[in-house]
UniProtKB/Swiss-Prot annotation:
InterPro entries: UPF0229 (IPR006698), vWFA_dom_sf (IPR036465). It comes from the Bacteria. This is UPF0229 protein Nham_0975. HAMAP family: UPF0229. Belongs to the UPF0229 family. Coiled coil: none annotated. Residues 58-76 have a biased composition (Basic and acidic residues). Residues 39-106 are annotated as: Disordered.
């Protein structure tokens, strides 16, 4: 019985345009639902499965059907006592008899299903990426690595695939009916038994026939080789290009005494979102965590997010630590360097000038992109409504922002600001537009 598999992209006579429009609409509903859940809950909730609900009307495909309250139509109805063939019936008006009560109308629940962690993160970070303003000194050279690509009939002896070769040999020997060694040995054993017995004419005739059969089988075994060159298979490899560009992201967080629990919580939420983003979109990106008070230190992921360390505030120590790590492990000629810094902006004026010097003279010329996020109080949102107003560190960084197109700065006042700010910082188009305008 034949089996037909429908591989059409537009099955069931549905319009291809409508189908694509439906998929786009459902995708937007999914993205909106996930973002709303993350805004109202914890950022780390995005790193797992999500039960998502979207309105049922968003899952329906458009279709043509006859309007129920207009047009002319004919029906075949059962007989009755009031009407005869040819009578015309008035259309019932809105709200007239025959209109169903609203409470009797059918309704459907929202369409609800579970997305996997990978699907959630793909939707969550779909149109975000690290800005890729490639350095002029960084040449685009591809490295190659071998990748298995099946089998070949020719190749180096070191790449011979014994399993595939023997399988081909076995199949060929079966197809050509090559005699087995056991068959020849059995005939020779029978000849030996006959020769050791009485040499009757019948026995001698049988021995001659068996010897002829042995010669025939041996000749066929010689003609049909056990392993023929046609059987040999080699492992085939293709050179797969891989980008030689390597990226590292520096995460700098202020954990000094001026950063209260609320400020630290918002900063950690921002960095958790950044961490999920990097893990989801860039497998080969390294992450360096630096926390600072009056002194800076490189820490691991767990310490960075869950440490309760506190102390004074000297922001320049974090920049100096970052510069030392770059010099030791991440040369600018080989690595694409990114940085994200979160602070409440509380810093001594003298140290803020030191930060300007470090950024202008050392760090910004090495970085592809630098994002600064300042955590402010909700009551300060209107006070610091313009970029001219702000803390000592904000005013200092404003001069860096004016000189370097790959520097971005913004503010966060509450948890609802984190995701919009994150999208603002890591949308490529925004940074590219800033670079174009300043040129």
């Amino acid at each position: 019985m034949p089996i037909f598999i429908d591989r059409r992209l537009n099955p069931k006579d549905r319009s291809l345009g409508n189908r694509q429009r439906f998929l786009r609409r459902a995708r937007e509903e999914l993205k909106r639902s996930i973002r709303d859940r993350v805004r109202s809950g914890r950022i780390s909730d995005a790193d797992g499965e999500q039960a998502v609900s979207i309105p049922t009307r968003s899952t329906d495909e458009p279709r043509f059907e006859a309007a129920k309250d207009s047009g002319r139509r004919e029906h075949v109805l059962p007989g009755n006592k009031h009407f005869v063939p040819g009578d015309r019936l008035r259309k019932p008006g809105h709200g007239a008899a025959g209109t169903p009560d609203p409470s009797m109308k059918d309704s459907e629940d929202d369409f609800r299903f579970v997305l996997s962690r990978e699907e959630v993160l793909d939707l969550f970070f779909e149109d975000l990426e690290l800005p890729d303003m490639v350095k002029l000194s960084l040449k685009e050279i591809l490295a190659f690595r071998p990748r298995r690509a099946g089998f070949a009939a020719t190749g180096s002896p070191t790449n011979i695939n014994v399993g595939r070769t023997m399988r081909n040999s076995y199949g060929r020997r079966i197809a050509l009916k090559r005699p087995k060694r056991e068959e020849v040995d059995a005939i020779r054993q029978e000849i030996a038994e006959l020769e050791s017995g009485s040499q009757s004419p019948v026995a001698r005739q049988r021995i001659a026939a068996l010897q002829a059969e042995v010669e025939r089988l041996e000749r066929k075994r010689r003609l049909i080789a056990y392993v023929d060159p046609v059987d040999i298979r080699f492992n085939r490899f293709e050179a797969q290009p891989i980008p030689n560009a390597k990226a590292v992201m520096f995460c700098l967080m202020d954990v000094s005494g001026s950063m209260g629990e609320r400020e630290k919580d918002l900063a950690k939420r921002f960095f958790v979102l950044l961490h999920l983003f990097l893990k989801c979109r860039y497998d080969r990106t390294e992450i360096v965590f630096i926390s600072h008070t009056h002194e800076a230190q490189e820490v691991n992921e767990e310490t960075f997010f869950y440490s309760t360390q506190s102390g004074g505030t000297v922001v320049s120590t974090a920049l100096e630590k970052m510069h030392r790590i770059i010099a030791e492990r991440y040369p600018g000629s080989e690595w694409n360097i990114y940085a994200a810094q979160a602070s409440d902006g509380d810093n001594a004026a003298a140290d803020s000038h030191r930060c300007i010097t470090l950024l202008d003279e050392e760090i910004m010329r090495l970085c592809q992109y630098y994002a600064y996020v300042e955590i402010i109080d909700e009551r300060e949102r209107h006070i610091f409504g313009t970029t001219e107003n702000g803390t000592s560190l904000w005013r200092a960084y404003s001069s860096v922002n004016a000189n370097w197109p790959n520097f971005q700065m913004t503010r966060i006042a509450d948890a609802a600001d984190i995701y919009p700010v994150f999208r603002q910082l890591f949308t490529r188009q925004a940074t590219a537009e800033k670079l174009r305008v300043r040129r």
